[in-house]
Amino acid sequence: MSSWIRWHGPAMARLWGFCWLVVGFWRAAFACPTSCKCSASRIWCSDPSPGIVAFPRLEPNSVDPENITEIFIANQKRLEIINEDDVEAYVGLRNLTIVDSGLKFVAHKAFLKNSNLQHINFTRNKLTSLSRKHFRHLDLSELILVGNPFTCSCDIMWIKTLQEAKSSPDTQDLYCLNESSKNIPLANLQIPNCGLPSANLAAPNLTVEEGKSITLSCSVAGDPVPNMYWDVGNLVSKHMNETSHTQGSLRITNISSDDSGKQISCVAENLVGEDQDSVNLTVHFAPTITFLESPTSDHHWCIPFTVKGNPKPALQWFYNGAILNESKYICTKIHVTNHTEYHGCLQLDNPTHMNNGDYTLIAKNEYGKDEKQISAHFMGWPGIDDGANPNYPDVIYEDYGTAANDIGDTTNRSNEIPSTDVTDKTGREHLSVYAVVVIASVVGFCLLVMLFLLKLARHSKFGMKGPASVISNDDDSASPLHHISNGSNTPSSSEGGPDAVIIGMTKIPVIENPQYFGITNSQLKPDTFVQHIKRHNIVLKRELGEGAFGKVFLAECYNLCPEQDKILVAVKTLKDASDNARKDFHREAELLTNLQHEHIVKFYGVCVEGDPLIMVFEYMKHGDLNKFLRAHGPDAVLMAEGNPPTELTQSQMLHIAQQIAAGMVYLASQHFVHRDLATRNCLVGENLLVKIGDFGMSRDVYSTDYYRVGGHTMLPIRWMPPESIMYRKFTTESDVWSLGVVLWEIFTYGKQPWYQLSNNEVIECITQGRVLQRPRTCPQEVYELMLGCWQREPHMRKNIKGIHTLLQNLAKASPVYLDILG
């Protein structure tokens, strides 16, 4: 009986936990094929006994195959075939390795559903032939075929062509067996009547009016005789084609304006490869105003509109039927141009009741015109309730022309409404006088109070006392990921310092800007399971740095990954052991467990056995991106000891940028706002792999990048948009602004934004609409992307997915060589 009692409580809970853990490992092992090991994202089969005879497949209701990103197979002599349906379930697969095995045949459509494949390694197998049709839809960065007994034929000439196109020092040594069973280098292979095809598009003038029709003709040539097809993308207009072996035509009828700017290609394809000839379609059409809405208030009032038309329409605004003469106070701004579509707004600087009225937009070009009208109400009329009709006949007001408000025609008196009651007029005049006296009295009283407070402030050491310096917890975004315990994270006083940010006479309402993402409890997955790591499995090696929350160490962690006995990790310790600190610690661990992405630093788990509490992250060999950029820039010779590292190329910068953008796309999809995106908070691993993440050290190491406000608050103002500086508003759009600054950092090799200006000067520049200049090494397309990130109006900034797509396309156009890391 006494032994049963001893198993109650925590001991029994631990026993049940151990049993579930054993069952979990048993299920994972049972679901994995014999001779293989499986994890949530990887399958590896390297045991030759008993080995596998077919491509590994996961059992139903086990690990989701869509999450598998890597499959590694080695020493499987009985694996000979990859069938069409063997790989289709692994839609997230990025790396496929089959080496030292018996692979002889790959079905033509084996990789049809694996569009994410980037690396394929078929080294030392039994392949005698391999068609390019397997891979033509894939964007492969690596295809390794060394050690296969290829037969010399036209079927493998595409591999030779691919090798010649790469022309890099790491070109593979490939051979094939000729008719005499002699091994000859693939680079020397010559096959008669076996060459690349050619395509020639005889395009007429492809500038056509909407609703018209056009015919394109194309001829192809080559030996082997190529197949010909048309690539029309997502063409909206009705089209039909006629093709023979070497000739073809494409008829497009009733051409739609939606097809303007689209590319049409004629493609010739044979065994060796493909060629294409393309033209761009330009459609001229009359303007249409597709969007005109009531004014919205941000930093300025804006009447938003969208206009389509080609050629570009001329825009003219009318106010209450009269031409609106634009000025610096009222002007048309085009924020985004998408070929034939223009998104913008009529911007009004501090409009009053005098600007209320009907606004008409007219757009016209040589093909026609369109107009739309919107009623705008900015402010209530003096002496009238805000919802009353300003055109009430007893109200007297004067016409306002261009000289006063830059609106309308100075000769137009149509806005005047004559008085119909002299007595009412006199009464209202008396009422106006009383109103002015009351307002003047209130203003005078406020000035006296302000002077009194300023006098008191002079006698205070810091100019600000008590509650005014307390950090607000009613932020419009969620609470910070990193621990904040009653302001104890910083050694400074709780009183506001003399360096508090001042704009004009108003102190900016700011809050603690966390190092990482904001999150609410509702965003955490209910089944979040944080991995717990035994303290004896963590062996500290050396200190990497110290942040506000504790020290960060390089360590070895044992029994963390099944394929490795030990791995290098970075561990973050928590020096504050208070109850609040521990709650925030566990909350952060749950958040990090939910964030799983190739460009977010991997979180392995926690160690809570004793103090200090520890978080375990993957270790990134080359440290933070800012230091890496500086070490591989033109000024590296000033900092390096001995031979300086190789300078980063433009293509490598694009490779870095698109990885960071990919991480930000993921965070946006998870509804997280980073709020401190900068190169100092990105880490660099091997092969130029970049991930978003930090360990709470950046505010100590990069203290000049932050601006202390009121003693507690540290703001990265050089990376912040106007709405974040002035209104403490952090959104995905504010992250987009920061991403634009990160691009600027990358192309300046890690320079500090606005390095020539003080913090107050930076605030003034950003709030006045100035932007960073184009770096010397930055392509124009990338700088235009930066400008798209730095639009003053948040809703006008580029979409994060669009940014990633553009950077990805630019990176693909520039091949990246990763030997910079040695």
Curated annotation (Swiss-Prot):
Question: What region holds the LRRCT domain?
Answer: 148-196
Q: Report the glycosylation sites.
A: 67, 95, 121, 178, 205, 241, 254, 280, 325, 338, 412
Identify the stretch(es) annotated as Interaction with MAPK8IP3/JIP3.
Answer: 455-466
Q: Where is the Protein kinase domain?
A: 538-807
Among Pfam families, the record links this protein to: I-set, LRR_8, LRRCT_2, LRRNT, PK_Tyr_Ser-Thr
Gene Ontology annotations of biological process type:
brain-derived neurotrophic factor receptor signaling pathway; cell surface receptor protein tyrosine kinase signaling pathway; cellular response to amino acid stimulus; cellular response to brain-derived neurotrophic factor stimulus; central nervous system neuron development; cerebral cortex development; circadian rhythm; feeding behavior
Q: How does it sit in the membrane?
A: Single-pass type I membrane protein
- Ranges facing Extracellular side: 32-430
Enzymatic class = transferase
Q: Pinpoint the LRRNT domain residues.
A: 32-61
Entry keyword annotation includes Ribosomal protein = no
Which effect does the record note for changing residue 434 to C?
A: In DEE58; uncertain significance
Entry comment on modification after translation:
Phosphorylated. Undergoes ligand-mediated autophosphorylation that is required for interaction with SHC1 and PLCG1 and other downstream effectors. Isoform TrkB-T-Shc is not phosphorylated.
Summary of the function given for this chain in its UniProt record: Receptor tyrosine kinase involved in the development and the maturation of the central and the peripheral nervous systems through regulation of neuron survival, proliferation, migration, differentiation, and synapse formation and plasticity. Receptor for BDNF/brain-derived neurotrophic factor and NTF4/neurotrophin-4. Alternatively can also bind NTF3/neurotrophin-3 which is less efficient in activating the receptor but regulates neuron survival through NTRK2. Upon ligand-binding, undergoes homodimerization, autophosphorylation and activation.
For this entry, the protein name equals BDNF/NT-3 growth factors receptor
Organism field: Homo sapiens (Human)
